[in-house]
């Protein structure tokens, strides 16, 4: 069973999902409002399933592509993506359920073992629902299952291939600036160091509902602009990185009573968006992107920069790309030539 997270006195709403679970920068930029506990409706009428883009029995999640608003006279309707995910259990609610007389159907019984289908009440049967609407072809491809391929990017590859490719894309991060400028999600900020050069904000990741600690997940977003990724880091950024590591761990300890040795603190490369940010997750949580091919522990990043000022400009970095990613083709062609 999951630990129960302490509930702050004025905690407001949470929302969602990264990688395949994450909203794109365009999606995040659009959500500048705050949530509400009042009943609401989906932002479209009807939903005719066209395709299951992806599903995972292990993660209890499914990604659906559908047509909406078909009855409103908009021709063939519009595309939308709906992501349905079972929410984690909460100890107090489950304990209360089992103390009562839950509705059960026996599936299997043998000696001391038995399996049932249990039909929970409404408060235990919620499904986290993420909507991407209107959805573009780019969104559909993003959530569609794709094979992954490992690539090894040299420092030269980054300067000559990856960076020009990124600069050719329209990768808006206005949603990040909205958070930093308190235009959106200000009520969700757990901690802030306001220093414009070496400060940051700490905010719960959208994948974490803050109702239990087993899947604790927060993001530190630096105030300083222009640091795109690990490749940009030099000793000039050590004060910022040390602040994020030390103050982020202290803030999480104070707020959630989780010590630093129970946290995984790391950066992604490649990141999902190009403004420096650091992930804080519960050590036992298998967070998306926490594998060795993408996660770089912040403590080791700091040590690498202390020992070699140009470590991340020189080092060959390994990461995975989807089969349909144009960058994969560019890097593979360069390595063959």
Swiss-Prot record:
Its EC number is 3.6.1.59. The hydrolytic product 7-methylguanosine diphosphate (m7GDP) efficiently inhibits the decapping scavenger activity and acts as a competitive inhibitor in vitro. Inhibited by 2,4-diaminoquinazoline. Residues 1-37 are annotated as: Disordered. Keywords: Acetylation, Cytoplasm, Hydrolase, mRNA processing, mRNA splicing, Nucleus, Phosphoprotein. The keyword RNA-binding does not apply. A motif (nuclear export sequence (NES)) lies at residues 142-154. It is found in: Cytoplasm; Nucleus. The modification N-acetylalanine is found at residue 2. GO terms for molecular function: 5'-(N(7)-methyl 5'-triphosphoguanosine)-[mRNA] diphosphatase activity; identical protein binding; RNA 7-methylguanosine cap binding. GO terms for cellular component: cytoplasm; cytosol; mitochondrion; nucleoplasm; nucleus; P-body. Substrate binds at residues 175, 185, 205, 207, 268-279. It comes from the Eukaryota. GO terms for biological process: deadenylation-dependent decapping of nuclear-transcribed mRNA; mRNA cis splicing, via spliceosome. The active site is at 277 (nucleophile). The modification N6-acetyllysine is found at residues 138, 142. InterPro entries: DcpS/DCS2, Histidine_triad_CS, HIT-like_sf, Scavenger_mRNA_decap_enz_N. The keyword Cytoplasm applies. It catalyses: a 5'-end (N(7)-methyl 5'-triphosphoguanosine)-ribonucleoside in mRNA + H2O = N(7)-methyl-GMP + a 5'-end diphospho-ribonucleoside in mRNA + 2 H(+). Decapping scavenger enzyme that catalyzes the cleavage of a residual cap structure following the degradation of mRNAs by the 3'->5' exosome-mediated mRNA decay pathway. Hydrolyzes cap analog structures like 7-methylguanosine nucleoside triphosphate (m7GpppG) with up to 10 nucleotide substrates (small capped oligoribonucleotides) and specifically releases 5'-phosphorylated RNA fragments and 7-methylguanosine monophosphate (m7GMP). Cleaves cap analog structures like tri-methyl guanosine nucleoside triphosphate (m3(2,2,7)GpppG) with very poor efficiency. Belongs to the HIT family. Homodimer. Associates with components of the exosome multienzyme ribonuclease complex, such as EXOSC3 and EXOSC4. Interacts with NDOR1. This is m7GpppX diphosphatase. The gene is DCPS.
């Amino acid at each position: 069973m999951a630990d129960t997270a302490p509930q702050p006195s004025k905690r407001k709403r949470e929302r969602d999902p990264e990688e395949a679970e994450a909203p794109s920068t365009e999606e995040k930029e659009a959500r500048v409002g705050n949530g509400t506990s009042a009943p609401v409706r989906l932002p479209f009428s009807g939903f005719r399933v066209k395709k299951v883009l992806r599903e995972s029995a292990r993660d209890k999640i499914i990604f659906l592509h559908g047509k909406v608003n078909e009855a409103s006279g908009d021709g063939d309707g519009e595309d939308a993506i709906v992501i349905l995910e079972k929410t984690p259990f909460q100890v107090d609610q489950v304990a209360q359920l089992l103390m009562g007389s839950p509705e059960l159907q026996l599936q299997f019984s043998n000696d001391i073992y038995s399996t049932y289908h249990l039909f929970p009440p409404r408060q235990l049967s919620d499904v986290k629902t993420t909507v991407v609407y209107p959805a573009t072809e780019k969104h559909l491809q993003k959530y569609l299952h794709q094979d992954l391929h490992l690539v090894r990017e040299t420092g030269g590859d980054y300067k000559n291939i990856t960076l020009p490719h990124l600069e050719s894309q329209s990768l808006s991060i206005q949603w990040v600036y909205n958070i930093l400028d308190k235009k959106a999600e200000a009520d969700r900020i757990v901690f802030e160091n306001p220093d414009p050069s070496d400060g940051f904000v700490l905010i719960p990741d959208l994948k974490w509902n803050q109702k239990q600690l087993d899947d604790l997940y927060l993001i530190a977003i630096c105030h300083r602009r222009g640091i795109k990724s690990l490749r940009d880091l030099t000793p000039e950024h050590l004060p910022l990185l040390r602040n994020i590591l030390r103050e982020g761990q202290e803030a999480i300890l104070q707020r959630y009573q989780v010590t630093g040795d129970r946290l995984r603190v790391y950066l992604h490369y490649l990141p999902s968006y190009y403004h420096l940010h650091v992930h804080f997750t519960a050590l036992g949580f298998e967070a998306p992107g926490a594998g060795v091919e993408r996660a770089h522990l912040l403590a080791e990043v700091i040590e690498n920069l202390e020992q070699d000022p140009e470590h991340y400009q020189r080092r060959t970095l390994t990461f995975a790309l989807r089969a349909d990613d144009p960058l994969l083709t560019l890097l593979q062609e360069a390595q063959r030539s």
